Amino acid sequence: MGDILAHESELLGLVKEYLDFAEFEDTLKTFSKECKVKGKPLCKNVGGPLKKDSKSLVIQRDLVAAFDSGDQKAFFDLWEGHIPSSVRDTDSLAQKLEFYLHIHFAIYLLKYCRGRPDKQELDKRISYFKTYLETKGAALSQTTEFLPFYALPFVPNPMVHPSFKELFQDSWTPELKLKLEKFLALTFKANNTPKLLTIYKENGPNSKELLQQLHQQLVEAERRAMTYLKRYNKIQADYHNLIGVTAELVDSLEATVSGKMITPEYLQSVCVRLFSNQMRQSLAHSVDFTRPGTASTMLRASLAPEKLKDVPLLPSLDYEKLKKDLIWGSDRLKAFLLQALRWRLTTSHPGEQRETVLQAYISNDLLDCHSHNQRSVLQLLHSKSEAVRQYMARLINALASLAEGRLYLAQNTKVLRMLEGRLKEEDKDVITRENVLGALQKFSLRRPLQTAMIRDGLIFWLIDLLKDPDCLSDYTLEYSVALLMNLCLRSAGKNMCAKVAGLMLKVLSDLLGHENHEIQPYVNGALYSILSIPSIREEARAMGMEDILRCFIKEGNAEMIRQIEFIIKQLNSEDLLDGVLESDDDEDEDDEEDHDIMEADLDKDELIQPQLGELSGEKLLTTEYLGIMTNTGKARRKGPASVQWSGDEPLRRPVTPGGHRTGCPVLGDHLISPQNAQQARNGCLRAMPVAHPDDYKEGKPGVTGCGTSSSFMDHKPREWSPAGHQKSRLVPTAALGWPREMTQDPSSGHITREFVPAFTCKPQVPSTPETVEQNPLKAKALSLAPQFSSSGPQQASRPASTASSTRGLHSSQSIRK
């Protein structure tokens, strides 16, 4: 009761203000009379003086009238008296408008005075404007838009000065008047809001929910920031340690040139600094530093990822009930279910847990891909609800990120047709289109779907989309260019491009100079591929493509320069390369890239948020849709070409951007444990297995780059020296290789052709090793494995397996005599 008495005057004032605002005139009179009878004081300054609509209109009319008549004093008296200072001093729109209003009154006599204007009055207005510029208007002096007008008071005849030509056009004053009227309407409408209504809005249920959501997001952001900070500090410390050790090793190598020996004690001290903590204690007892190869074996063993605890499987679900609610439920329920199903897939641990989730979706035909009913889950892609359409596209994109998911979606062409239709129709929701495009790009890893997309004219749609790349998000740009490149790898795709050769070449040449450097490998790949068609080469020469490319050689980095040089070589070639297949349009499934790329963009910018007490995510699934034994295991399909290729077939493998968008590639689940895959996603991938140089001979293609086996052209066996096969591979992430010129090994006399990755991914995680640039003059000496003398014990060959603790990094060269 004491609190009420302390604030009784303000509370009664709020009620009076609201009754006045709502025009309850009789009620207001009765209320005021009763307050007076009871001796209750009414606060007169609750929310400032209440401006009723009628009074506001009068003020607005007076301001506009003063504007029209050029009455500067009357206008600014009303302006300063009725526009709150908080608005005039802090609102950028109000400040800009006031600046132009001062210009209007300063030049009013010059524009509207018949005959010669009164010099004294004109000087007075110019002086007033000059004073404004030196005081309040000085805040805008650094703005480019207003900078020329600071010279206005000093120009003898502004009407003929080119800088002020716009001010004296007939349209300038009406446009300024319209801006003034809009500003006044918004300002006085805001001032009319009673404080009681403002308090209600600020403390309503929506505000509480919003505050709760913001608080939750803040907590999560702080938690992630701390995690990333710890990772960063560890990576930085490891980097500094590595640089220090490298510097010492360089000094030691220089010393050995002059004949100085390296002692075992020094080698031991270096290895101790490189080994992980768990091995340092036993290092002195387990490593014989006098025997070559022992230390390197122990070092590689120390870098092997630790085994983590087994991850439990997620509970089974009632998929019949799930699909029923996805078809017949409310739009909000559909959106939450689609979100939860996606989260179950994207947040599961790579390996058995994720495979079990995926196989449950497939075996229960979650999306009704095999259903012929009129209403199916797939139809949600064309829902009237924006949230449902977007979340359906996100789920399909997540499924397409996994090899088995792509196989499930590809078994029925209606999924592809629906995605193509949604892609061309979706013009409202950017995220929906991004996810549809991402799914189609991943579909392009499969040859039958490539063929279907080429036949459907998707290349023409992509070319039209990429004509204005600055209007596209980074995701849309990268995935559309990567999709275009994948389709251009096929003969049918190249022939499609030949129909619009001029436009295609113009779009690609424009993309070469785009600020998003992530698209460069795909642009170069597409350009190199289509230039194998003679008609496109002729068109490129006619438009001066070589000069355009040489401009980028001057500005690009070494990798970009190397790629462009080979494109120029292709451009200037007269005949098709030897060894080109007559047709690459067979539909064999062994072109499938059997890899999984679950990029972080799948869960970005969630459109819906649960209200208080509303279930979402895994809690929604396990509370309302718990099932019995619907998680059925199934062995992963392993195509013979998923790991290696025959010597007769050229490397023609499509790629997807997702692998390097997430920072580092994710290892194939069937090749590594779920613990290792999770560490790879977290940026803890320690070593990247590459191929043995002894495994390859001339003309025998294999796997290059970041563990990929992808190429973008037909090639001569003698022109290209591939890097060979790889027993266990990483996810293909846009790694396409270029050969270097032949050099002679000075130590052996053998002719050596190096194969260096030109179209290679750039891992963004410092712990992921990058490809080493090799010197042609020292081809044999640059193997990452240690070199041994003939007298000492030799290191045994180690298979390049991710599961092996004795993995080795060997140079990817092919040597021919």
From Swiss-Prot:
Task: Locate the compositionally biased regions of type Low complexity.
Answer: 793-807
GO BP annotations of the record are: cilium assembly; positive regulation of smoothened signaling pathway
Q: Where is this region: Disordered?
A: 637-659, 761-817
Q: Where in the cell is it found?
A: Cytoplasm, Cytoskeleton, Cilium basal body; Cell projection, Cilium; Cytoplasm, Cytoskeleton, Microtubule organizing center, Centrosome, Centriole
Gene3D superfamilies, per the entry: Leucine-rich Repeat Variant
Chief location: cytoplasm
- Compositionally biased spans, kind Polar residues: 765-774, 808-817
Keywords, A to Z, come to: Cell projection, Cilium biogenesis/degradation, Coiled coil, Cytoplasm, Cytoskeleton, Phosphoprotein
InterPro entries recorded: ARM-like (IPR011989), ARM-type_fold (IPR016024), ARMC9 (IPR040369), ARMC9_ARM_dom (IPR048959), ARMC9_CTLH-like_dom (IPR056327), ARMC9_LisH (IPR048957), LisH (IPR006594)
- Please list the coiled coil stretches: 204-230
Asked if the Swiss-Prot or TrEMBL record annotates the protein with the keyword Cytoplasm, the reply is yes
What's the subunit arrangement here?
Interacts with TOGARAM1, CCDC66, CEP104, CSPP1 and CEP290. Interacts with NDUFAF2.
Q: Which PANTHER family match?
A: LISH DOMAIN-CONTAINING PROTEIN ARMC9 (PTHR14881:SF4)
Name the record gives this protein: LisH domain-containing protein ARMC9
Species the sequence originates in: Mus musculus
